[in-house]
Amino acid sequence: MGQKINPIGLRLGINRTWDSRWFAGKAEYGKLLHEDVKIREILHKELKQAAVARIVIERPHKKCRVTIHSARPGVVIGKKGADIDKLRKRVADITSSDVVINIVEIRKPELDATLVAESIAQQLERRVAFRRAMKRAVQSAMRLGAEGIRINCSGRLGGAEIARMEWYREGRVPLHTLRADIDYGVATAFTTFGTCGVKVWIFKGEILEHDPMAQDKRMNEGGGESSQPRSRRDAA
């Protein structure tokens, strides 16, 4: 089962928590969920060059707090905060709540599965040899402290007539072990030969305590992300 299921979904409530953190009754649930989807679509579209790994949405009383986890916070903020103010206004057009945007810096993007997958996909689009891109990502992750990493690339690799799947693994990636801290990311490369899919699993160690927030705490303590987020509040 652990080989097939999304490893993040399998560990929700054990050592990882949801990226949408709010509660609503039946009357508002659908509306708020649709807002979350639109907010994420807009932010990913506007911040293509900002290396965004996660977007966490929280809804305290009459507010919408959006936390953007990015490896390039300067690109998100812009000159004198101009870009983040534009983003806040775009998000405010979707939701009726007061909007607060926080930026959390990812200090080691080589250990974030989503950013690794997107990096490989971008290299495939630039016609970099897929084996070289995969090996480089594996070496970088292991050098920075990952206990294991696996990368799958599938599609018409290298322009081959027949699509196939190639994979590399170094270290161990225990997908069945629920206490394992495994990050998972996917990306799609749009090449002239068609689309190529990239999947990345990164094993960062074990989390022994039963705490849904354990992974976030561990990243802040271990230097994976800065513990002091930068914020821009709604002027209203």
From Swiss-Prot:
* Region described as Disordered: spans on this chain: 213-236
One GO CC term, this protein:
cytosolic small ribosomal subunit
Q: Pfam families from the entry?
A: KH_2, Ribosomal_S3_C
Q: Which GO terms describe its biological process?
A: translation
Q: Which CDD domains match?
A: KH-II_30S_S3 (cd02412)
> Transmembrane stretches, by residue range?
none
Which keywords label this protein?
Ribonucleoprotein, Ribosomal protein, RNA-binding, rRNA-binding
| Classification via InterPro entries | KH_dom, KH_dom-like_a/b, KH_dom_type_2, KH_sf_prok-type, Ribosomal_S3_C_sf, Ribosomal_uS3_bac-typ, Ribosomal_uS3_C, Ribosomal_uS3_CS
SMART domains assigned to the protein according to its UniProt record, in alphabetical order: KH
Q: Name one GO molecular function term.
A: structural constituent of ribosome
Tell me which residues make up the KH type-2 domain: 39-107
UniProt keyword Ribosomal protein, yes or no = yes
Give the Gene3D superfamilies listed for this entry: 3.30.300.20, Ribosomal protein S3, C-terminal domain (3.30.1140.32)
Q: What does this protein do?
A: Binds the lower part of the 30S subunit head. Binds mRNA in the 70S ribosome, positioning it for translation.
What interactions and quaternary structure are annotated? Part of the 30S ribosomal subunit. Forms a tight complex with proteins S10 and S14.
Among PANTHER family, the record links this protein to: 30S/40S RIBOSOMAL PROTEIN S3, SMALL RIBOSOMAL SUBUNIT PROTEIN US3C
What family does this chain come from, according to its entry? Belongs to the universal ribosomal protein uS3 family.
User: What protein am I looking at?
Assistant: Small ribosomal subunit protein uS3
Origin organism of this chain?
Bradyrhizobium sp. (strain BTAi1 / ATCC BAA-1182)
Q: Which gene encodes it?
A: rpsC
